[in-house]
């Protein structure tokens, strides 16, 4: 059976880790490289590094931070933000990223996912989906550009399409739950996880350790991502994993 992954997320703006509520009201949470080193030592299964304003501000990835983060960490690192071309992916992989997350560019041009997967392999291509529930309906709309731009695109249909084009993993964030500490959007997570055949990382809304368990058990995700509960010292990675083991989930535990 697969091992459940616990993934801290470093949302970075202007070279600092930040944490917001519903993608706004950003709060400083420290230096990204220092945070990465701490999470690596704490036993995180992976690290997700997202330059959250790169696409919106039309600028490139902070490659120096990416390089220093990758050099400091032994765990796999996924990097995203402002990834628009095959050359962007190549540069990130050469800088030390293990996987690259594509968001707005995948929505704008689906074939980009296919090109990337064919060139680098689907194992390192992650498509990030930021979704928001359509009021009064059991449907979710995709937003792009750091959650600033609605698209009218159905999140479930989009997930199925990008997987058919070669996406090896989906990083799914509920904009409604992001930063609220009220738990994952389980109907959204479950709907997408049950509709595709690749791993789904649940993101957005973790406020306690039971929420992590819920994402796997009820959301059918294969990995869970969290930020604020780890960044501000409320829980450690080991506490999270120990709790999940007690709840019967298969985890990788360091000695």
From Swiss-Prot:
EC number(s) recorded for this UniProt protein: 4.3.2.10
Pfam families: His_biosynth (PF00977)
Reaction(s) this enzyme catalyzes, per UniProt: 5-[(5-phospho-1-deoxy-D-ribulos-1-ylimino)methylamino]-1-(5-phospho-beta-D-ribosyl)imidazole-4-carboxamide + L-glutamine = D-erythro-1-(imidazol-4-yl)glycerol 3-phosphate + 5-amino-1-(5-phospho-beta-D-ribosyl)imidazole-4-carboxamide + L-glutamate + H(+)
Subcellular location: Cytoplasm
Alphabetical list of SUPFAM superfamilies matching this protein: Ribulose-phoshate binding barrel
Record bears the keyword Metal-binding: no
GO BP annotations listed: L-histidine biosynthetic process
GO CC field: cytoplasm
GO-annotated molecular function: imidazoleglycerol-phosphate synthase activity; lyase activity
Highest taxon of source: Bacteria
UniProt KW Amino-acid biosynthesis keyword: yes
Active-site residues (renumbered): 11, 130
Pathway it works in: Amino-acid biosynthesis; L-histidine biosynthesis; L-histidine from 5-phospho-alpha-D-ribose 1-diphosphate: step 5/9
Alphabetic keyword roster: Amino-acid biosynthesis, Cytoplasm, Histidine biosynthesis, Lyase
Family listed: Belongs to the HisA/HisF family.
Function as written in the Swiss-Prot or TrEMBL entry: IGPS catalyzes the conversion of PRFAR and glutamine to IGP, AICAR and glutamate. The HisF subunit catalyzes the cyclization activity that produces IGP and AICAR from PRFAR using the ammonia provided by the HisH subunit.
Oligomeric and partner information: Heterodimer of HisH and HisF.
HAMAP family in alphabetical order: HisF
Name this protein carries in UniProt: Imidazole glycerol phosphate synthase subunit HisF
Organism: Rhodopseudomonas palustris (strain HaA2)
Source species taxonomy: Bacteria, Pseudomonadati, Pseudomonadota, Alphaproteobacteria, Hyphomicrobiales
